[in-house]
Structure formats: structure tokens, C-alpha cells
Amino acid sequence: IHMDYGILGSSDLDQASPFAAKLQTNLLLPLIYPVIRDGRFKSRLLQKRLTQRKSEMGGYVQAFMEMLGGARPYVTVQSCKNQFYSDLVTPLPDKINVPGTEIHIFYALKMGEKYRERYERHFANPVIHKQDLQHEELLACYPERWAQLVKDIMEGKR
């Protein structure tokens, strides 16, 4: 399979050892899975905190939650566990360079410099599109801009 373009978002490429990945999965899944399955946190404290964050951060948190798509009762906990864990333990080499493939990364500056360093470590020549935004804010809050950027990349304008 050959791709002309690879487009990644803000927090892709998280990695951990099998032990750390299992620990993260087992700690976070009970908190996150109810949001995926039911569209809301099971914990009243977390749901209250989400409500507070929605009022503090304007439309970003609401748009992000809407982007997640609401309740998905058909998604099993085992499926989420497998995806979360495998994302963390799948090895990724450094300085990937596939001739004829351009790697484009939508980099949310508000996530921090460590992400830029990660992109530059794993890809030989990534094209980094800096956005002065939060995690996935471009897609969640400005889908037209996101789509235009993807279109411009595909048409060779970026």
C-alpha cells in the first residue's frame, strides 16, 4: 500500500511500555468508557467537572464532546480496551521516510512542545501545520477550516 499523504492530529503517537500501557488502560478505561458508551461520565464528580469546563472554555468543550458523537451503546468495553492498549504499545520507528509520501501534522500549539518534538523524532520531514488551538479544536470547532486544510494538502497547496 502506498499513500501520497499521511495526515495526523495533535496527540497521535503516544507510546508506552506494555506494563505502563496496561496500567494506563486499567486506570483510564473505567473513567472514559461510560462517556463512549453512554455519552456522559458515570462519576457525578467528573460529570460536574465537565459541566464546569464547558462554561469556562466557551464552545470548545461542548464541540469536542459533540465531535465524539454522543452515546455508542454498541461499543464494548473490551473493544475500547484493545484499541487504547494497542495504540500505546504499537512500536513506531524514528525518522520514518517513505519516498513519495508527505506526512502532514495538525499541531495544536496549546498542547505543548513535547508533541512537536515527537513528530520530528518519528518522521524525517513532517510538514507541521501549527494551530494556536487546543487538542482537536480545529476539527471540533472549525470543521470548515479543517476540511479546507485537508483539501489544500491534497491539492498540493500546502
What kind of feature is each model-predicted range?
Residues 75-121, 138:
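Conserved serine/cysteine hydrolase catalytic core
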Residues 2-35:
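Flexible "cap/lid" loop of the alpha/beta hydrolase fold
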Residues 2, 122-124:
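Short, structured coil segments at secondary-structure junctions
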Residues 131-147:
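Catalytic histidine-centered segment of alpha/beta-hydrolase-like enzymes
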Residues 17, 37-96:
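Conserved alpha/beta-hydrolase catalytic His-Asp/Glu region
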Residues 17-22, 116-118, 141-143:
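Short aromatic-enriched loop/helix-cap "lid" or pocket-rim segments at secondary-structure transitions
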Residues 148-157:
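C-terminal alpha-helix
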